[in-house]
């Protein structure tokens, strides 16, 4: 009896693992636009961008957990972390009620500003992680994967704006991550702290982007009927 239960549990776990693997492979290979001029219908384009943003947030979360497990040894280290993120100066909705008060074209440009702002910290993470003592390959590979998928996410968001709100193109705000020089610091703890803060902030922002895109898909594509 116990062996049958164990076999069923093992089978279920295997199916979940295969499902996750197929999902990741699908996201990695699915083009944001199916043609050079991107004639992908807006509902399908939203579906692809939402799937991609969720995948990126999952990668950020995995990377944060891995870094936390490898380098964060005590609460004292966490206490030193800066609460504010470089993008905190950007006024973004905190919940669905606030998001409903923001015009969709404005929210799309806020999303674009956040995603664009990830380019430099991602590059610095990939460059700097190689110099960290015993940096796990899993963290480095995830950072590289995020950098690649981030380009596709930017393309998808820009295509959505072009299709739905062409008059709003070019209205994004360009943000600079002021903490980046700390990633090149000499002191080992300072560098680890800078990496921790940046990965934490990237994860936080990716969660915002994921939620905003899901909200906008519901609002624009499904007319709030979801």
From Swiss-Prot:
Alphabetized GO MF terms: hormone activity; prolactin receptor binding
Subunit structure: Interacts with PRLR.
Biological process (GO), any one: response to lipopolysaccharide
GO CC, one annotated term: extracellular space
Domain of life of the organism encoding this protein: Eukaryota
Major localization listed first in the record, in broad terms: secreted
Name of this protein: Prolactin
Location relative to the cell: Secreted
Residues annotated with Phosphoserine modification: 53, 117
Region forming the signal peptide: 1-29
Stated role: Prolactin acts primarily on the mammary gland by promoting lactation.
């Amino acid at each position: 009896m116990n062996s049958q239960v164990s076999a069923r549990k093992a089978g279920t776990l295997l199916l979940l693992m295969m499902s996750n693997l197929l999902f990741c492979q699908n996201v990695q290979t699915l083009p944001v636009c199916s043609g050079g001029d991107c004639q992908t219908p807006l509902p399908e384009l939203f579906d692809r961008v939402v799937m991609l943003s969720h995948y990126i947030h999952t990668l950020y979360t995995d990377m944060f957990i891995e870094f936390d497990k490898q380098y964060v040894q005590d609460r004292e280290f966490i206490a030193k972390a800066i609460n504010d993120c470089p993008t905190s100066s950007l006024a973004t909705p905190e919940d669905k009620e606030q998001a409903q008060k923001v015009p969709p074209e404005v929210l799309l440009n806020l999303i674009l500003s956040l995603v664009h702002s990830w380019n430099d910290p991602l590059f610095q993470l990939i460059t700097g992680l190689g110099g960290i003592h015993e940096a796990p390959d899993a963290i480095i590979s995830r950072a590289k994967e995020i950098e690649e998928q981030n380009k596709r996410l930017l393309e998808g968001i820009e295509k959505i704006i072009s299709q739905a709100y062409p008059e709003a193109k070019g209205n994004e705000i360009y943000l600079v991550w002021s903490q980046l020089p700390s990633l090149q610091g000499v002191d080992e703890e300072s560098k680890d702290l800078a990496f921790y803060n940046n990965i934490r902030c990237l994860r936080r922002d990716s969660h915002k982007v994921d939620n905003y895109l899901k909200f906008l898909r519901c609002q624009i594509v499904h007319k709030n009927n979801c």
